[in-house]
Structures are given as structure tokens and as C-alpha cells.
């Protein structure tokens, strides 16, 4: 427990809009370190020689006597800042990354027991291959039945991303450090609960800043999807091309069993991305300036895909 030493915490977790894939979550934790105890090269430190890379770190917030996990991962780097002057304090910044780093560092080839199976079963088979703990998984059954694993040399994260694209679902590390695999129907059908509503009208939850964007970042009007062993399935929207020029996107070697499934995925991508969209990039909250009890909860209780 090092809360009393912490001066700043920054957490970044989310999905890349261009690739439609979740990326590794990161966190920077800055500590006051006037004694040098958090300098990993200091032999006089009470923690020496145990300040090494990949030590586990858990970041949580407490509200109304309940703990809310914000990040669970591993310390990647210890950055020490030696500051001089009457008003300066030496600090150490712990640069952290979530379990995606471990998945990306675990090489696999043949996946045991991975014949024709549901996408969720394939996720579990890949995680079994690298001995990922059962207690750190939250895996949907999935809505697609996949081909047998190709058995190529790759890392576990690449294999999981292939399943994610084949399912047309989502896979990420949640704030508790669990691998979450969400099926495509769950992505569409499952509403977030509880619902937090934001407004600037003096009702609901107030915010200090909301960044709204309207651009072509997500625009794709020509889509080609190719399954492993299949032929490219292409769909396009000519009115969108005429209006916004050509924006092409491709996926290859997904593991669905038929060309019809690949075509259905291409049609789904085109339907949702052929036109520019208005989106909220960020909402900034000041958790101390409002009596609405849902405001702090909105700051600590919202998970990815909520």
C-alpha cells in the first residue's frame, strides 16, 4: 500500500478506432521519493533488490467504503527524477502496462485441442497453451464456430486478435486484470448497467469538458474480408465513395468456416462505417464539485464497452 506517497496517477485504456482492436492499457504512477527507497539502484533502499521490472501493481479507488479497480498490470519501468531546490521533491514514476504485454511475449504454434470449435473455446485453448490462470478469464461462448487453428508460429496476443476479428467481437484486459472476451451479439445486445447520464443543464451528471468530433477517422466504404482458405468477399457503397472518396479496408485469414460468413462481416462493417459519425472522444469530470452521488461512481465504475 503506497497511497500516501502518490502524487499523480494517469491511466489509459481503450480501443483503436482505426484497427477496431483494443490496445494494451497503460498507467503512470508518480511517487514522492525523498528517501530514495523507490530508486531501484539504491542498495540502501528498504526494498532493494526487489524493485525489478514486471512487479504486479493494482490501482483502485475507494468510494463509500467500496473499492473500485481502475487498473491491474505490471511495472515496466522505474523513472527516477532527482530534483534540487527548496520547493522541489524527488520523484519516481512507475510506468506500467497491463497483461497484454505478457500475452504478446508468449510464443505459441500448435494450440492443443483446437479443432473446429466455438470462438470462446478457442480463446480458452490459447490461454491454456500459455497457462493463463482460470481465475483471470471472463470468456463468452461466442457466436461463431471457427476452423481448426492454423498452427503457425505467432504470439498468444496475435492468436487472440485473430479470434476477435473472426468472431467480430472484442477482447481486452479489464481493470481487474482478467482477459475479457465479448461475443459480437453481446456487444450489440448487452446494455451498460447502471446507466450514467451526463448533461450541462443542471440535471444528471455535470462535466467540465466534453470533446466532440466529426471527421472521417472511422470512414470505410470499400470492405474486403478473406477467410483462411477462402476467396475475398468485397462490398462497397458507391454513394459514399462519390461523396467522400475511396476509403478501403481489408481483413484476411479470419477463421470463419464459409465465405458467406466473411461476406456477412464485410456487410456489417460497411453498414456501420460508410458514413462519417459524430462521436464523443472524451468527457472530463471534477469529482469534487458536485453533490450528485453518481458523479464519483461514473468516474470509477465505468468499464470498457459500458
Regions found by a protein language model. Give the residues of each.
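Assembly/oligomerization scaffold segments
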Residues: 1-117, 121, 125, 129, ...
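Short, conserved helix/loop micro-motifs enriched in His/Cys and acidic residues
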Residues: 134-151
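Acidic, small/polar-enriched beta strand-loop surface segments
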Residues: 1-3, 115-116, 158-165, 170-306
Amino acid at each position: 500500500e503506497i497511497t500516501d506517497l502518490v502524487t499523480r496517477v494517469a491511466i489509459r485504456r481503450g480501443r483503436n478506432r482505426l484497427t477496431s482492436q483494443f490496445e494494451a492499457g497503460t498507467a503512470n504512477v508518480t511517487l514522492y521519493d525523498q528517501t530514495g527507497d523507490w530508486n531501484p539502484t539504491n542498495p540502501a533502499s528498504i526494498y532493494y533488490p526487489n524493485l525489478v521490472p514486471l512487479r504486479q501493481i493494482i490501482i483502485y479507488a475507494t468510494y463509500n467504503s467500496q473499492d473500485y479497480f481502475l487498473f491491474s498490470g505490471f511495472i515496466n519501468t522505474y523513472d527516477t527524477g532527482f530534483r534540487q531546490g527548496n520547493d522541489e521533491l524527488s520523484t519516481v514514476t512507475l510506468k506500467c502496462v497491463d497483461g497484454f504485454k505478457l500475452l504478446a511475449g508468449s510464443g505459441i504454434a500448435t494450440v492443443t485441442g483446437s479443432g473446429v470449435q466455438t470462438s470462446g473455446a478457442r480463446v480458452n485453448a490459447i490461454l491454456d497453451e500459455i497457462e493463463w490462470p482460470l481465475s483471470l478469464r471472463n470468456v463468452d461462448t461466442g457466436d461463431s464456430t471457427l476452423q481448426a487453428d492454423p498452427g503457425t508460429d505467432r504470439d498468444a496476443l496475435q492468436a487472440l486478435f485473430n479470434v476477435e476479428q473472426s468472431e467480430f467481437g472484442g477482447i481486452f484486459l479489464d481493470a481487474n486484470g482478467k482477459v475479457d472476451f465479448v461475443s459480437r451479439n453481446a456487444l450489440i445486445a448487452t446494455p451498460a448497467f447502471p446507466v450514467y447520464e451526463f448533461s450541462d443543464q443542471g440535471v444528471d451528471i455535470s462535466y467540465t469538458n466534453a470533446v466532440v468530433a466529426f471527421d472521417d477517422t472511422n470512414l470505410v466504404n470499400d470492405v474486403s474480408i478473406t477467410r483462411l482458405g477462402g476467396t475475398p468477399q468485397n462490398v462497397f457503397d458507391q454513394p459514399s465513395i462519390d461523396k467522400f472518396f475511396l476509403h478501403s479496408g481489408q481483413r484476411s485469414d479470419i477463421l470463419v468456416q464459409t465465405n458467406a460468413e466473411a461476406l456477412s462481416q464485410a456487410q456489417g462493417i460497411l453498414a456501420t462505417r460508410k458514413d462519417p459519425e459524430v462521436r464523443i472522444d472524451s468527457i472530463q469530470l471534477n469529482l469534487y464539485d458536485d453533490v450528485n452521488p453518481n458523479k464519483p461512481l461514473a468516474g470509477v465504475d465505468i468499464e470498457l464497452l459500458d
